[in-house]
């Protein structure tokens, strides 16, 4: 008896959160974006229709769980369920921005740990693997009982600044906006051969931050603030103002995830920040544009990760 082993095909599908990024990733991988419709019933319930056979395929579903967070998360869960019930061979949830990541631990009594809950329901829905970038807290990787590949935005941001004249300059310093971002700031600083400084802040309440001290030499320096995400932009703009007040020459900022909610755009436009560099893990095309914001694409690194996962080769090279 002859045994026939046929390799399962690769197909990429997208929810509604960031279809432009999904199309760019599919183009780089060299496959057409799969045909699936994610719509709404009249009462707002989400409906998913897969318009092609997916039996036995290696399915990659691209969906950031950005605002509206709950809608986009439910879209992803229902898509995963639909593919599982349609007998997809393997389902990888590609989540460039992982919502609810800030609720990764109890900060006071009776707090939920929603980052863990989301990991559990993604697994329960039928995801076999998760591919994401710059989780707000790296320990979230341990919340999953399925394989998770955690890509980094620092190489993309570091390359941009290195190619635009910030590499090996004595007057450049990389600034961590808080103690929790020091590791990220150090990795970024290593790429442009710069020292680091640290802002010591406190949060009297959510989305509100106050600068207490600045550790490091920033006087007459060009400072680059780096964070994993910018939400209301309070931390980054307060930090930039504090740097200038203490003698910094110029302030640039960069982040992986541009959440940009509430007063963020107004704060950035009115701040001393000369330029904000971000990645397109979140679609900000519908937000009022700003001349200060430049968006770089993560499509090449996600496309390469998808190719490596599909071909069953190491993804770790992409973490460097």
Swiss-Prot record:
One biological-process term from Gene Ontology?
5-phosphoribose 1-diphosphate biosynthetic process
| One Gene Ontology molecular-function label | magnesium ion binding
Q: In which pathway does it act?
A: Metabolic intermediate biosynthesis; 5-phospho-alpha-D-ribose 1-diphosphate biosynthesis; 5-phospho-alpha-D-ribose 1-diphosphate from D-ribose 5-phosphate (route I): step 1/1
Name the cofactor(s) required for activity, per the record. Answer: Mg(2+)
List the active site.
Answer: 201
Residues that coordinate or bind D-ribose 5-phosphate: 203, 227, 231-235
Q: What EC number(s) does its UniProt record assign?
A: 2.7.6.1
Q: Where in the cell is it found?
A: Cytoplasm
Relay the cofactor remark from the entry. Binds 2 Mg(2+) ions per subunit.
Residues that bind Mg(2+) 2? 178
Checking SUPFAM superfamilies in the record gives: PRTase-like (SSF53271)
Q: Entry's PROSITE patterns?
A: PRPP_SYNTHASE
Q: Which reaction does this chain catalyze?
A: D-ribose 5-phosphate + ATP = 5-phospho-alpha-D-ribose 1-diphosphate + AMP + H(+)
Q: Name one GO cellular component term.
A: cytoplasm
- Superkingdom, natural source: Bacteria
* UniProt family annotation: Belongs to the ribose-phosphate pyrophosphokinase family. Class I subfamily.
Subunit record text: Homohexamer.
Task: Describe its function.
Answer: Involved in the biosynthesis of the central metabolite phospho-alpha-D-ribosyl-1-pyrophosphate (PRPP) via the transfer of pyrophosphoryl group from ATP to 1-hydroxyl of ribose-5-phosphate (Rib-5-P).
- Please give the name of this protein: Ribose-phosphate pyrophosphokinase
Q: Which organism is it from?
A: Clostridium tetani (strain Massachusetts / E88)
Q: Which gene encodes it?
A: prs
């Amino acid at each position: 008896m002859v045994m026939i082993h046929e390799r399962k095909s690769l197909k990429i599908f997208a929810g509604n959160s960031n279809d432009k990024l999904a199309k760019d990733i599919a183009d780089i991988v060299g496959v057409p974006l799969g045909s699936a419709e994610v719509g709404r019933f009249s009462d707002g319930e989400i409906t998913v229709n897969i318009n092609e056979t997916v039996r036995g395929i290696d399915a990659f579903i691209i969906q950031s769980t950005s605002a509206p967070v709950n809608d986009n998360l439910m879209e992803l869960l229902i898509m995963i369920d639909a593919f599982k019930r349609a007998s997809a061979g393997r389902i990888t949830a590609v989540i460039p921005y992982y919502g609810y990541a800030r609720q990764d631990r109890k900060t006071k009594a009776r707090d939920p740990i929603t980052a863990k809950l989301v990991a559990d329901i993604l697994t329960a829905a039928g995801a076999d693997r998760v591919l994401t970038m710059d989780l707000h807290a790296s320990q979230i990787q341990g919340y999953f009982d399925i394989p998770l590949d955690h890509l980094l935005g620092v190489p993309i941001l570091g390359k941009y600044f290195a190619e635009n004249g910030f590499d090996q300059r004595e007057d450049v310093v990389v600034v961590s906006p808080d103690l929790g971002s020091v590791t990220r700031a150090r990795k970024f600083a290593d790429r442009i051969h710069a020292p680091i400084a640290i802002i010591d802040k406190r949060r009297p309440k959510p989305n509100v931050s106050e600068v207490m001290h600045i550790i490091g030499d920033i006087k007459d320096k060009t400072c680059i603030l780096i964070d994993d995400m910018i939400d209301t932009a309070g931390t980054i703009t307060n930090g930039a103002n504090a740097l200038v007040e203490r003698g910094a020459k110029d302030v640039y900022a960069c982040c992986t995830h541009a959440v940009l909610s509430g007063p963020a755009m107004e704060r950035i436009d009115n701040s001393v920040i000369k330029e904000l560099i971000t990645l397109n893990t979140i679609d900000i095309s519908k937000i009022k544009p700003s001349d200060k914001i430049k968006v770089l694409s993560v499509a090449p690194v996600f496309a390469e990760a998808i190719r490596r996962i599909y071909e069953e080769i190491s993804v770790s090279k992409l973490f460097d």
